[in-house]
Amino acid sequence: MEYAIKEIARVIGAKTNQLLDDTVSLLLTDSRRLSFPEKSLFFALKTKTNDGHRYIQELYKLRVRNFVVSDMLPEFESMKDANFLIVKDTLRALQKLATHHRKQFNIPVIGITGSNGKTIVKEFLYQLLHNEFNIVRSPRSYNSQLGVPLSVWQMSEKNTLGIFEAGISQPDEMERLQPIIAPTIGIITNIGEAHQENFLSSNQKCMEKLTLFNDCEAIIYDGDDLFIANCIESACLSHKAIAWSRTDSEAPLFIESIDKKEFETIIHCTLLGFNRVVTIPFTDDASIENVIHCMAVMPVSYTHLTL
């Protein structure tokens, strides 16, 4: 999907040196990944160890002509046929553009968060659903402040379902990721010790993660995890909650028994009132839980996913 540079400048609130007519379809944050220079928009990101502005001259020589920068350096003045979109924060500009892109699509989107298992659950869901949906999903573990907008930018008119993961390491980060993913269905895998040092408490971290689901139609979680259940209630999200359970026979997905063999596990369950037997090639507790999270999406799919 292509965007005019003039539209992008408006969306990200950029000042400009000039606005030559041009369109782009690719976002670039790493100069080493350049493939189609004429259609690339380079974001000069600043990190603790690097500064993307250093690579603009090199990229210009390689025929890139569109840049988002926070500093207008003297050497850029000679690049008369290039567009420079000047913003205060280039990462924030990237996130704003990805949010705008997400708004162009009215398809179901599954958002996954939690301390562990996000990528595995995403890939398991892809295997379960890819025959029914044209799926766009996060590459690898692209779940950061940078990875999420790059993932969502992949959305196109051909897609009928999105599956994206979101990770945070400190407070207030999910507030930025939520409108980029804008999930219609949420999954929270678990709450562990990852990045705990940056939060005042596990409760604060869980509540921060649940921010992803503010506008969801359904939230899937382990109903036997009372800590997550209490956080969901505190966040006033209980009316959206769809819990799977090992103890509540009235749950949409009730796990009756888990029978571990040497090389496989047999799960006996009741799914929407129907008895099912599921055999999986895993025996470790983490993989079994990840599979059950994915199984819990199936009853949700009947009402919240549309072909």
Residue map of PLM features:
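Short, surface-exposed acidic/glycine-rich loop or hinge patches that mediate macromolecular interfaces
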Residues: 47-50, 88, 115, 142, ...
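Loop/helix-junction capping segments adjacent to catalytic residues or to phosphate/diphosphate-binding pockets
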Residues: 50-53, 145-146, 171, 288
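Acidic, Mg2+-coordinating active-site environments of NTP-dependent enzymes
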Residues: 11-12, 74-78, 187-305
